[in-house]
Amino acid sequence: MTNEQLQRKHQSLATLITRIIFLVLGLITIGIFIQSYYFSNKIIKQEVMLTKQQTSALVKSLFNNHLSILQIHHDSNSKNEAIRRFFLDGDDEKLEYYFLSMDQADPTHTPEFRFLTTGEGLLWDDGNAHFYGVNEVLLEKISQSVLFGNNWHFMSLHTLMGLRNMLVRRSPVIDTTTGEVLGQYYISVVLDNNFPLVEMLESGSNSDNIVMLVGDKVISHSLSGNEPYDLDSLLAMRDEPSAFDDCLISQTPIEINSTDTLVSILAIQENSHVASLQRQHYLGLATSVVLMLMLSLAIRSWIQNRVANALESLMAYSRFAGTGEKYERFNGSDILEFAHIGHTLENTFEQLESQRRSFQDLFNFALSPMMVWSESGLLIQMNPAAMKELGIEHASPQDFSNPLFQLFKLKLSPHLKMAAQGATLTGINVPIGEKIFRWNLSPIVVENGISGIIVQGQDITTLIDAEKQSNLARREAEQSAKTRADFLAKMSHEIRTPLNGILGIAQLLKRSVNDAENLKQVDVLCNSGEHLLAVLNDILDFSKIEQGKFNIKKRDFNFYDTLNTLENIYRPICREKGVSFEIHNQIPLDCQLHTDQVRLNQIMFNLISNAVKFTPAGRIEVSFKLEKFARSEHSILSIQVSDTGIGIDESKLESIFEPFVQADSLSTREYGGSGLGLTIVKNLVEMLEGEISVQSELCKGSTFYLSIPVEKGECEEQKTPTNPKPEQLFGQGLKVLLVEDNHTNAFILKAFCQKYQMSVEWVQDGTQALEKLKEHAFDLILMDNQLPKMGGIEATREIRETLKLGTPIYACTADAQESTKQEFLSAGANRVIVKPIKEQELHDELLHFKAHYWVEH
């Protein structure tokens, strides 16, 4: 096709650009015209609306100011001696003289009429009400309508002269000596034909006229009749306002006591300045259109001459480059874009060649194996790293037939088929010999078709070996943790079983020994057992914390219960030791808190027990305070535990919360302890999302500060708990089945139960228990865990599932693990008691049994 044919078929780029620019400028001009017209109209309307709003606000302010001044005069008058004296001695001459002087002093702010009332009815009126058709009967009606408050009241009243719209307000007249309300002082502002009020609003708002409406009815106006409009036309323009009307109408609704009323005020102003502004706007738009048209023609001529020459030079260079002749440089152009296009064409082939060489170098020198496969699964190319891993020295057919390559190809083929369908695969593990490689397969998409597949590999043999070692170490750690947990559970059971006997016998001896020296020895036995139990519990708790098995269960509880528990436990202990124990509580006793009560009690027991242990003399103080912070959903329970004990050396404060750490070895020998108490406290506080800190001075004492977030619940009336004597707890003797293989534990439990007038039958294993239950009915079953023949958990399940008995079962086990407790409860037990069982603990459980399960026969 010749150049002439091309020119006839296609337009010149210069001509096309010129036409496009001319078209764009035309569209821009039209757009600017439309936008200018739109925004100018909008600005005019906004200006009109702003003027209306300002006028409306000014009218409302003037009206409210008028009422405010009347209200001030009204309240001031009600306190005047002349009015009070009138109620006392009836001197109406002085009263009328007083009101006359007030009206003369400020005639602008004078009500239309006034009247006074007492509880018996109308007492006095100024006589002005009759001018508005309001007689004494209507005055009584007004006073009955305005019975409460001292605010303005709007009312429409049918009078002798027709319907009157008015504002009424009352103010009490009080005897300053006795404080007695003598009566009520009423004032009224009649809105109908209130020309002084209308003139005041007209002059104050700089309006031409004012019209006052009630609904759509005109009740007062300032029109003289010489205006180019009448009331009907004003109301019509009010309903269909326009920014370009001859007059501007602002309607102001009147609110009384922040309540909408039917009263509204129309302010009419001249609108000639808006019409003038509109004419100037149209003239400016016409001028802009003419200027834009002239500018467009000038730009069209300049572009057509300027662009055509530069474009022809670029076209000549592109035609020369397209012939494939010798490479030459572009001569350049004055137009930046054309120069850029020319230089881009100049560098295209050089860049393509450079890219080809760079890609080949990247492929050949990469340390990771790389391959290119066809979509049909044939190897096209591989880099030296891949040849090395596959044992290929030369890309010959003999090398590709070696078993290592064939096995690799066989394992890679399924993934190549997926990639050939367009899927991008990552993280595919395919080994080469003894090494494991992770491969990424990516299809090469050209013109919506797949021309090949790039395969890249990475040696992850070391990573796989490390992962295997990590899994092995994890399994060994889990087995070690399980072994330790099983060991602690076994030791807990083995220690708690004889400890139950020691503490049980000690408690029985305490009630039967009368000799002071023997009682002292029994106390030593009790204290030693309690100490051993505390150490055991600390070790188990610490083990649970390490394993992450300590659960937080938040619920609502009465804070008084915690205070009562601390008071009952530690005051006798401190009294016996000769140490003062004080609780300073700033929280209401009936306050409900939402947190984990069990863990909170455990924290307090550990801290106060430490204070008792390390305070040989002096005092221990515990304080509680509940703080609420702004913008926080939680309150902060602040706790402070102080003692005057041996204190802690400053160098030991940083490590005092670490496990198995005490202030010094001398303290450990003298006071004992496991060194886990404060560690458990710190972990529990952190689990409750709180903070703990300590201040201490050696030989002077220590203070622990705790801050725990809690939610404050509803307060409820505190009920004083009753604690009946054992023999009075049940009205008749209970029949109890005791399942226990240990003779000592059975002896102790039977002795405890006999205090409650219980009839106890003892069996030594689960099988015997089932036989007994088939023959006799019992009120309560006390079930041990580890029993010969049939264990306690299995026996409990048989009682529930086979015998179908609902008899309450209280499990008594020396295994303190949470898993054992859950197994018992899942089998059907009602409660789980952990040995050693103390007398008070058994009493509490029997109280629970009576409250939830006991039915008197």
UniProtKB/Swiss-Prot annotation:
Keywords: ATP-binding, Cell inner membrane, Cell membrane, Hydrolase, Kinase, Membrane, Nucleotide-binding, Phosphoprotein, Protein phosphatase, Transferase, Transmembrane, Transmembrane helix, Two-component regulatory system. Residues 735-850 form the Response regulatory domain. It comes from the Bacteria. InterPro entries: AI-2_sensor_kinase/phosphatase, CheY-like_superfamily, HATPase_C_sf, His_kinase_dom, HisK_dim/P_dom, HisK_dim/P_sf, LuxQ-periplasm_dom, LuxQ-periplasm_N. Its EC number is 2.7.13.3, 3.1.3.-. It is a multi-pass membrane protein. The modification 4-aspartylphosphate is found at residue 784. Its main location: membrane. Residues 490-712 form the Histidine kinase domain. At low cell density, in absence of autoinducer has a kinase activity, and autophosphorylates on a histidine residue. The phosphoryl group is then transferred to an aspartate residue in the response regulator domain. The phosphoryl group is transferred to LuxU, and ultimately to LuxO. At high cell density, in the presence of autoinducer, the kinase activity is inactivated, and the response regulator domain has a phosphatase activity. This is Autoinducer 2 sensor kinase/phosphatase LuxQ.
